[in-house]
């Protein structure tokens, strides 16, 4: 079952799993793809999927946010490193998305099957991201229409990072794990 993890109660196993999935795997997949593309003289595009949580993230997502922050740095670094090989590396960093997985996760946490719909109604666009619009954004980034963009992080959410009516802050102090 899902459990939030903050800086005080994240264990090494969870931290290593987050890094393995969100940082290590993309690192070596990009490495293998780049070697093939360079050897075969292929111009192309690599698109990473990031998260708005990479910017700092919610306290209860500390290992996840850390791993996605590392992915953003990898994207910018490799986008620069491979540009003379005509390999574009960019990232779409998505916000809260209305996926089947997210619905199941939120319902298991809250017991409320309508939680997402109620919260989405309070958002500026009265909804959260749809997986189909995320897919369309990735298709655009992978197409020639994205031009020479490389090493770029595109934040795909209904907020502007750093622009708040009232700056967010944690609701409570952290408690030491039991």
Language-model regions: role of each:
Residues 51:
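Residue(s) in the substrate-gating loop at a strand-loop-helix junction
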Residues 5-7, 14-16, 119:
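Substrate-binding pocket helix/loop in short-chain dehydrogenase/reductase
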């Amino acid at each position: 079952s899902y459990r939030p993890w903050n800086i005080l109660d994240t264990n090494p196993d969870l931290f290593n799993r987050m890094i393995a999935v969100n940082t290590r795997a993309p690192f070596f997949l990009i490495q293998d793809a780049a070697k093939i593309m360079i050897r075969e003289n292929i111009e192309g595009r690599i698109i990473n999927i990031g998260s708005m949580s990479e910017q700092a993230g919610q306290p209860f997502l500390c290992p996840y946010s850390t791993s996605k922050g590392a992915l953003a740095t990898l994207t910018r670094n490799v986008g620069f490193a491979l540009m003379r090989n005509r390999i574009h590396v960019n990232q779409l960093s998505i916000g809260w998305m209305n996926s089947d997985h997210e619905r199941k996760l939120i319902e298991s946490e809250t017991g409320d099957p309508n939680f997402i719909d109620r919260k989405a109604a309070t958002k500026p666009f009265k909804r959260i991201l749809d997986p189909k619009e995320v897919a369309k954004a990735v298709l655009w980034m992978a197409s020639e229409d994205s031009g020479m963009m490389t090493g770029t992080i595109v934040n795909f959410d209904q907020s502007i990072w750093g622009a708040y009516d009232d700056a967010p802050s944690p609701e409570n102090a952290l408690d030491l794990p039991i």
